[in-house]
Regions:
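Flexible, gly/pro- and Lys/Arg-enriched active-site loops
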Residues: 1-152
Length: 152
């Protein structure tokens, strides 16, 4: 999430941070990921080593290597006791906040233009347990921080 709350632009991310992608892979590998259909479309393919649950109202929706779910409850039931990563987009986050207990966030220290913002996020509801700052460099146009938040 950028300093201005932006999380997307043009059905993608408004930044390219290779270390963020590497961390995302490390965190989610071997786990189930819940995403909205637009997020699935923006990724464009199943991510290896991870189970993809796609929340959509379209009963006829189907994609190879993805499981369609119609509700948060169905997604939680399918994930069982395993960790379920809610990876976006904005519409899904807006309804999933009540079930999210831990947030692995990348704060991008920039204010890019965007067309998707993280709605419903209130920092006062969370306690920071981890922060690791990274400066801009040849591979990363913006400074950023990896942050872990747990619900108060």
């Amino acid at each position: 999430m950028a300093d201005n709350g932006v999380i997307g632009r043009g059905n993608g991310l408004p930044w390219h941070l290779p270390d963020d992608l590497k961390r995302f892979k490390a965190l989610t590998m071997g786990h189930a990921m819940l995403m909205g259909r637009k997020t699935w479309d923006s990724i464009g393919r199943p991510l290896p080593g991870r189970r993809s649950l796609v929340l959509t109202r379209s009963a006829g929706w189907h994609a190879p290597a993805a499981e369609r779910v119609a509700s948060l409850e169905e997604a939680a039931a399918r994930a069982g006791a395993a960790t379920l990563f809610v990876i976006g987009g904005a519409e899904l986050f807006s309804i999933a906040w009540p079930i999210i207990g831990r947030l692995e966030l990348t704060e991008v220290h920039a204010a890019p233009e965007g067309d998707v913002w993280l709605a419903g996020f209130d920092r006062a509801d969370w306690r920071e347990t981890f922060r690791e700052r990274h400066d801009a460099d040849a591979r990363h146009a913006h400074p950023f921080s990896f942050v872990t938040l747990v619900r108060r």
